[in-house]
Amino acid sequence: MRRGRSRPAGAAPAALLLPLLLLLPLTGCDRLAAAPAEHAAAAGDPAQDADRGRRLPPVVDHVRTDDPVVFLTYDDGAERDPAFVGLIRERRLPVTLFLTDTVAGPAYGDLARLRPFGASLQNHTLDHRSLRGLPHAGQRAEICGQQTKLRSRFGVRAHLFRPPHGTYDTTTLRAAADCGITALVLWRATLDADGALTYTRGDHRLHPGDIVAVDPDHPTAANLAARTERLLETIEEQGLRVGNLENYL
């Protein structure tokens, strides 16, 4: 897989993740790793940029809330499944789509038509480069460049960012802050090729506030719409519903 702001009633501040260890590289967004390096979760304030005396955006895989909601997130490729697009429209699903310009650019027109049905369009860089280790200027160009694209094509000022492959460093946080990003979004669960959930940490069930990543392009998976339908059944069986991540972060 190339791979809102008032907080709703009952929504508490986002859980903030400040990993003590950098994330290990994933195999790439062409396949979300079944169990990426565990994201150390700790509630607290955003990281402080010692060089500039400013707060850096938190890294989150879970939102602290008492609302019975989980959040469905997709990277580039979801728009290529007409049945998935139809599902979003029919169910008015408030999914979050993280977009890379060089991948999703040709489908921007189709994506724009999903916004009235609840889809949120957020930042996944211009070119899907792995950011960790790149100089500040390079990371800033990737993130701010896509901010400009999203603003010019959709009129949206994205404030959520998913780093390609889930890898980042402190320079990423600084560059993201420069570009107006308020949170880096990872995931606590992924949907595998068979429609089952795999968890990066904690017990193996969904909890209110969990962020779920769905790989649109898994090479051996059933079509995206069918997997999403099965996931929705699991969510409903656990007494949960899909929330709009943009409203909680």
Curated annotation (Swiss-Prot):
Specify whether Signal is a keyword of the entry: yes
InterPro entries given for it? Glyco_hydro/deAcase_b/a-brl, NODB_dom, Polysacc_deacetylase_ArnD
Is-annotated flag, keyword Signal?
yes
Name the Gene Ontology molecular function terms of this record: hydrolase activity, acting on carbon-nitrogen (but not peptide) bonds
Biological-process GO terms, alphabetical: carbohydrate metabolic process
Could you say which residues form the signal peptide? Answer: 1-43
Write down the superkingdom of origin.
Answer: Bacteria
UniProt domain NodB homology: residue ranges: 68-243
Keywords (alphabetical) are: Signal
- For the region Disordered, give the residue spans: 40-59
Q: What is this protein called?
A: Uncharacterized protein SCO4760
Q: Which organism is it from?
A: Streptomyces coelicolor (strain ATCC BAA-471 / A3(2) / M145)
